UniProtKB/Swiss-Prot annotation:
Lineage summary: Archaea, Methanobacteriati, Methanobacteriota, Methanomada group, Methanobacteria
Catalyzed reaction equations: DNA(n) + a 2'-deoxyribonucleoside 5'-triphosphate = DNA(n+1) + diphosphate; Exonucleolytic cleavage in the 3'- to 5'-direction to yield nucleoside 5'-phosphates
Hydrolase keyword on record: yes
Organism of this sequence: Methanothermobacter thermautotrophicus (strain ATCC 29096 / DSM 1053 / JCM 10044 / NBRC 100330 / Delta H) (Methanobacterium thermoautotrophicum)
Biological process per Gene Ontology, one example term: DNA catabolic process
Protein name per the record: DNA polymerase II small subunit
A GO CC term assigned to this protein in UniProt: DNA polymerase complex
Function summary: Possesses two activities: a DNA synthesis (polymerase) and an exonucleolytic activity that degrades single-stranded DNA in the 3' to 5' direction. Has a template-primer preference which is characteristic of a replicative DNA polymerase.
Amino acid sequence: MNEIIGKFAREGILIEDNAYFRLREMDDPASVSSELIVKIKSNGGKFTVLTSEMLDEFFEIDNPAEIKARGPLMVPAERDFDFEVISDTSNRSYTSGEIGDMIAYFNSRYSSLKNLLSKRPELKGHIPIADLRGGEDVVSIIGMVNDVRNTKNNHRIIELEDDTGEISVVVHNENHKLFEKSEKIVRDEVVGVHGTKKGRFVVASEIFHPGVPRIQEKEMDFSVAFISDVHIGSQTFLEDAFMKFVKWINGDFGSEEQRSLAADVKYLVVAGDIVDGIGIYPGQEKELLIRDIHEQYEEAARLFGDIRSDIKIVMIPGNHDSSRIAEPQPAIPEEYAKSLYSIRNIEFLSNPSLVSLDGVRTLIYHGRSFDDMAMSVNGLSHERSDLIMEELLEKRHLAPIYGERTPLASEIEDHLVIDEVPHVLHTGHVHINAYKKYKGVHLINSGTFQSQTEFQKIYNIVPTCGQVPVLNRGVMKLLEFS
């Protein structure tokens, strides 16, 4: 019960002994306590001491923000799910850690992205780098970026290599549009170049990414809710906001219009960091409310278990979860989350995963590579993860930069290549909501249910808490539960 007392204390509320003993005897004191805090705040937060008499009073007063259901939630008696896992690396992710695996990994990446680039009409006549001759021939080549740098005259040099050789590509700063485009090129991505061969260099006239075609909008007769970065077990986990979300999705919270939207939700997609984890960063134990990883997942099972069973929940791990650190991450191991695995409507998949939700191709990726992209590319930031997602789509790779903050497993196949263009790309990690529709693809970052951490305060990162994006029959809506 010290945890319950702490919950009230963090909200500036003390508990009299009689109220404490009554709470202790209740079936679910944690949930009741959270509900009481919500009710106290909704009444102006004027009470600083919770008494037994106030318990009686609160249980007789409806929260004005909470509308009691006027009958059962109107959802189909039996739902037919047309759910398909298109890509899940949980059981096909292998590496021995030998140098041969790393060579195979980069060969896989190069081959996959080269095939995509070769389909571009501008690169139909591309030739191997080793076949480049002297003179001033107009050429097209495809290669992996080995290095990117500026010269002392502020021209851009891109070192390209393929399976036959290497070449330096020059982008003149007088070509403003192309130079600006070249500033978004990062190491280890695969690009195509059209230009003129001049001595040891190719002077670029155009640079091509694998890119994405504009896709046709997918018709939907249902809704999908998206969340991520719940961080259960942290002292900064916003349990009250999460409980409001659960009540809403169950049809017990919100206006009639909001309850109608809840009834339409068929899928809930969770993009990682379900729990806060253990030993993720130095000093984390000081910020934990639950210091055992098994107990964190037990609490997660309690909270997610309250979500109505006619919603299919699709869940992947993030860097705070108990899966391995290197991407692609297999699904959360059952040995750490047995109670969570007992919830029959949860599908546990890898990070990343590609699924079909009644025909809506949904690519789910936690988003750790956003750190590398924000540090490497001018104009990209955590606050605008939609722009990062746009770049990753154009590069057709979820984590193009190797060897920086995002650990990548050197496997025989690169599973982070975006082979198939999704209708939805759902991410998390940065704790800041973002949305953009790009070439018909819904780019969604679902924010967090964790308030600002000490780390975020240092870097002035302001999270958007308790804001849940819902794709309502093809139209994006944002619900706030904070």
